[in-house]
Amino acid sequence: MSRYRGPRFKKIRRLGALPGLTSKRPKAGSDLRNQSRSVKKSQYRIRLEEKQKLRFHYGLTERQLLKYVRIAGKAKGSTGQVLLQLLEMRLDNILFRLGMALTIPQARQLVNHGHILVNGRIVDIPSYRCKPRDIITVKDEQNSRTLVQNLLDSSAPEELPNHLTLHTFQYEGLVNQIIDRKCVGLKINELLVVEYYSRQT
């Protein structure tokens, strides 16, 4: 299944706010209308919608998300929390959380087009897994820095999560540590996502 490229507002009306997909928000009251129409949601549908929320927010294909679930299942600790850590530490998501891109698809384009360096080397793989002490910088070229500066100026000022530091004037971000669960940028019940996949096997 390919990455979603359809109408974004349609997704947030059904699933709620997906800040990684779009900066738009559902209209006030739309959640209530959706709830009134779906009072008798099956447990399967509830799990499916949580899985879809995760997939669309981080901009993943079904195959990519399944791969992350399997990796998380083999790691120590809570599968759900490890899954969120894996997704949050992707390079495209780190750029988004730093405010260098307005959405994760936009961050992915920056990476794909070679505008981003990690520890002094160009990384053009959006799924690159960042680690503590990684330094993310914008390429020292005018078009790259102008592009990111425009995005920084356009992004709504938000408090950075504890695991990241941004040095705006140096066009530099620092990964301080692995993200805490409380700092995840999406309202999600990750246990339902794990349950969804465990029932598919």
From Swiss-Prot:
One of the primary rRNA binding proteins, it binds directly to 16S rRNA where it nucleates assembly of the body of the 30S subunit. Residues 89-152 form the S4 RNA-binding domain. It is found in: Plastid, Chloroplast. The gene is rps4. Belongs to the universal ribosomal protein uS4 family. One of its GO terms (cellular component) is small ribosomal subunit. This is Small ribosomal subunit protein uS4c. InterPro entries: Ribosomal_uS4, Ribosomal_uS4_bac-type, Ribosomal_uS4_CS, Ribosomal_uS4_N, S4_RNA-bd, S4_RNA-bd_sf. One of its GO terms (biological process) is ribosomal small subunit biogenesis. Part of the 30S ribosomal subunit. Contacts protein S5. The interaction surface between S4 and S5 is involved in control of translational fidelity. Its main location: plastid. Keywords: Chloroplast, Plastid, Ribonucleoprotein, Ribosomal protein, RNA-binding, rRNA-binding. It holds the Pfam family Ribosomal_S4. GO terms for molecular function: rRNA binding; structural constituent of ribosome. SUPFAM superfamilies: Alpha-L RNA-binding motif.
